[in-house]
């Protein structure tokens, strides 16, 4: 693929580029172009991704620096915590990384969140870059500068806004994704269309057969469009003071389910379940027709996402929902849909309405 990139802005000024490639061969040039050559670098990856791609990435980094280190942690959301961050700090300290060094996040959303938070906190903040290898990370967690880790049973409770210096997407890494992981990314993509772009939502639904074959050209079109939509939202509201909160559609109840399931369901699966709950509440308010509600549920099924969760008490889900980190003065900032492709923030969703959504997803 010829070099393609999307420029993400903040306050109208250039912030960082997102590179779209089909291999790692342009990474060294991208680092040079962004003024990152010569830095000491530490690749952060998990035990699943490191054996697949760490050597390839290290070879590219060694073209622009003599000092490349590696930190690998056990894969899974259960290790996205302060204990792993402490281990990362120990690695950075032992290898002498300083304020001019660079953290290289290689992997999915867990790796990106953890690496970014570690970079934000280490020596009061050092540079980092994102090399997302899952669809979920490419379209969601690698764009926007949100970083963080889970604290005990509370998801993303400790974190910081820390923008990467660049994002480098090798879309060929998607070909190694298990189908379940691919579906998780599609949940976030469907969410993006439902928030603010009905045409994009319709496109993703209409082309599901080609998309599910992981056709490279179709994936490239879809990923670039999704990143452009999210980047636009982030540019206008980098620290989630308003519009950016819309990106949390499906996440409030979704995070509660994820926590109660002890992370045995993947994040994207829980977001899909949360989308169904938000759609049910929106329908209850008369904001979605029955047909639109069914269309949302059908879109999730097209990509193999679960619509229901088993074995959880609706009251337990409600209690967990009300511990969401986005609570403000005892009120949930809930995202509702007003038709397909339009959403808004609502602070008046009652417990009774929440239970309507929760009962819609419980079996």
Which sequence ranges carry the predicted segments?
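A glycine/threonine-rich phosphate-anchoring loop and its flanking beta-alpha core
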Residues: 117-210
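Short glycine/serine/threonine-rich phosphate/pyrophosphate-binding segments
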Residues: 110-117, 138, 256
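ATP/NTP phosphate-donor binding region
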Residues: 1-101
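Generic secondary-structure signature for well-ordered alpha-helical cores
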Residues: 62, 94, 163-166, 172-179, ...
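C-terminal charged capping/lid subdomain of soluble metabolic enzymes
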Residues: 2-7, 187-189, 287-363
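Active-site segments that bind and position negatively charged phosphate/pyrophosphate groups
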Residues: 207-315
């Amino acid at each position: 693929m010829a070099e393609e990139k999307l420029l993400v802005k903040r306050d109208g000024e250039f912030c960082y580029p997102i590179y779209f490639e089909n291999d790692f061969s342009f990474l060294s040039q991208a680092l040079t172009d962004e003024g990152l050559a010569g830095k000491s670098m530490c690749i952060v990856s998990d035990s699943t991704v490191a054996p697949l791609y760490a050597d390839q990435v290290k070879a590219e980094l060694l073209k622009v620096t003599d000092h490349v280190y590696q930190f690998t942690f056990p894969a899974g959301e259960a290790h996205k915590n302060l204990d792993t961050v402490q281990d990362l700090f120990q690695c950075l300290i032992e290898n002498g990384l300083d304020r001019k060094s660079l953290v290289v996040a290689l992997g999915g959303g867990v790796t990106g969140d953890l690496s970014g938070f570690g970079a934000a906190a280490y020596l009061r903040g050092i540079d980092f870059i994102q090399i997302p290898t899952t669809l979920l990370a490419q379209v969601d967690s690698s764009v926007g500068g949100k970083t963080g880790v889970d604290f005990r049973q509370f998801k993303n409770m400790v974190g910081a806004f820390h923008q990467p210096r660049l994002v480098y997407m090798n879309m060929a890494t998607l070909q190694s994704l298990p189908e379940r992981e691919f579906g998780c990314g599609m949940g976030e993509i469907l969410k993006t269309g439902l928030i603010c772009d009905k045409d994009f939502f319709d496109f993703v639904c209409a082309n599901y057969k080609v998309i599910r074959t992981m056709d490279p050209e179709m994936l490239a079109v879809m990923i670039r469009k999704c990143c452009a939509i999210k980047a636009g939202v982030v540019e206008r509201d980098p620290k989630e003071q308003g519009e950016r909160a819309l990106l949390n559609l499906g996440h409030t109840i979704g995070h509660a389910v994820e926590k109660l399931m002890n992370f045995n369901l993947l994040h994207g699966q829980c977001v899909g379940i949360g989308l169904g709950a938000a759609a049910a509440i929106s329908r209850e308010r008369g904001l979605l027709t029955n047909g639109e509600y069914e269309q949302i549920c059908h879109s999730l099924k097209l990509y193999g996402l679960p619509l229901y969760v088993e074995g959880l008490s609706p009251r337990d889900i409600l209690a967990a929902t009300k511990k969401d980190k986005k609570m403000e003065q005892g009120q949930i900032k809930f995202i509702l849909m007003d038709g397909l492709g339009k959403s808004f923030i609502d602070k008046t969703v009652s417990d009774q309405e929440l239970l309507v959504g929760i009962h819609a997803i419980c079996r």
